[in-house]
From Swiss-Prot:
Organism of derivation: Synechococcus sp. (strain WH7803)
GO CC entries: carboxysome
GO terms under biological process: glycogen biosynthetic process
Name of protein: Glucose-1-phosphate adenylyltransferase
One Pfam short name: NTP_transferase
PROSITE patterns: ADP_GLC_PYROPHOSPH_1, ADP_GLC_PYROPHOSPH_2, ADP_GLC_PYROPHOSPH_3
Length: 431
């Protein structure tokens, strides 16, 4: 795997994940209490023995840069390993921003070409899954493909949201359609049992969806980008073009948990699914294939007379006499007496506040970090460093689906209340 370079696409402005992307790039959005989205593809690469990685971003990349530089020093073992962020930049040849996935790679192809590698692994920075890329790349090599696309078997309902592939029995891609509907969708069905699915599973999931993960052979990638300078997107333009001109395209079927965390609803569900018993769909408890993140050296969490069920609590948290059910709490979370948290995601804090600091804040009419006394929070996301006052109710009482209240420090997306980073919600507020 030393002859593979990974390119992780950080995504655009992250409008579908707004307001979580208000102050950070999409790959830097916190996940599962202590990780960030970018930790998933990077950990998959490290576990697959791929140690050369570039992360392409163009929006709010400060916290992402900080996280990566503090977490991944892959050259310490005297190899050539690195994780480097490449932000969109203007040059005389390309005065514009990244205009799509393929355009982002094209703008930096001068840098990627300098590396003496055989394959380029193109990954997405906003997906939750565990995958051994070495199997994927070996499949690409053994089939003699020019381009291999990772494919996920899906049912008809899910299929409408993806680019779909129709393949022959050897997995060679014959046709590619972007988000087909109706009869156009039915024509894309394939017998997925020949890719290792059981007969029952194959019947339920007869479509192969593109996961947005690709392996390109070196010459194929640069030739496609060079010959088609107006093509901006891999899925919509570059792959159909490669198919049309007769390149050898193969699919690699991945039949395991995979979730695209592109929207607030999907992000919320994916986080809370981690609390499922007895086995969550995705687990961070895997010694063979761990997910890495920044070591923070925090003390253990302290729970005082609390009732907690089906929840995940990040380290360095202090929970007083509260009731927490089916929730995920991030590092350094503070929850005071008589608080009820249900079906919620608290991202925690970036720093501690001492007891004396909290007392002084209260005296001056301020609100300390965390969730104040007597507050009820249901079906909500509280971003980092949120200060929720006492006797606050955050339950979306009017069952609003979408709302923007930036002046009050919150938004509602998919019926979920999202309190923004560093927001202060005064005592007695009802949302």
């Amino acid at each position: 795997m030393k002859r593979v370079l990974a390119i992780i696409l950080g995504g655009g402005a992250g409008t579908r994940l707004y307001p979580l992307t208000k102050m950070r790039a999409k790959p830097a959005v916190p996940l599962a209490g202590k990780y960030r989205l970018i930790d998933i593809p990077i950990s998959n690469c490290i576990n697959s023995n791929i140690n050369k990685m570039y992360v392409l971003t163009q929006f709010n990349s400060a916290s992402l840069n900080r996280h990566l530089s503090q977490t991944y020093n892959l050259s310490a073992g005297f190899g050539q390993g690195f994780v480097e962020v490449l932000a969109a930049q203007q040059t005389p040849e390309s005065p514009s921003w990244f205009e799509g996935t393929a355009d982002a790679v094209r703008k930096y192809q001068w840098l990627f070409q300098e590396w003496d590698v055989d394959e380029y692994l193109i990954l997405s920075g906003d997906q939750l899954y565990r995958m051994d890329y070495s199997l994927f790349i070996n499949h690409h090599r053994s089939t003699g493909a020019d381009l291999t696309v990772a494919a996920l078997p899906v049912d008809a309902k899910q299929a409408e949201a993806f680019g779909l592939m129709r393949t022959d029995e050897d997995g060679r891609i014959l046709e590619f359609r972007e988000k087909p509907k109706g009869d156009s969708l039915l024509e894309m069905a394939v017998d997925t049992s020949r890719f290792g699915l059981s007969a029952e599973s194959a019947k339920e999931r007869p479509y192969l969806a593109s996961m947005g993960i690709y392996v390109f052979s070196r010459d194929t990638l640069f030739d496609l980008l060079h010959q088609n300078p107006t093509h901006k997107d891999f899925g919509k333009e570059v792959i159909p073009e490669a198919l049309q001109r007769g390149d050898r395209l193969k699919s690699y079927v991945f039949d395991d948990y995979w979730e695209d965390i592109g929207t607030i609803g999907a992000f919320y569900e994916a986080n809370l699914a981690l609390t499922q018993q007895p086995t969550p769909p995705f687990s961070f408890y895997d010694a063979e294939f761990p997910i890495y993140t920044r070591p923070r050296y925090l003390p253990p969490s302290k729970l005082v007379d609390s009732q907690i069920t089906d929840s995940i609590i990040g380290e360095g948290s202090i929970l007083k006499s509260c009731s927490i059910h089916h929730s995920v709490l991030g590092v350094r979370s503070r929850v005071e007496d008589e608080v009820v948290l249900q079906d919620s995601l608290l991202m925690g804090s970036d720093f501690f506040e001492s007891s004396s600091e909290r007392a002084v804040l209260r005296e001056r009419g301020g609100i300390p970090l965390g969730v104040g006394k007597g507050t009820t929070v249901k079906r909500a996301i509280l971003d980092k460093n949120a200060r929720i006052g006492s006797n606050v109710t955050i339950v979306n009482k009017d069952h609003v689906e979408e709302a923007d209240r930036p002046e009050h420090g919150f938004y509602i997306r998919n019926g979920i209340v999202v309190v923004v980073k560093n927001a202060s919600i005064p005592d007695g507020t009802v949302i």
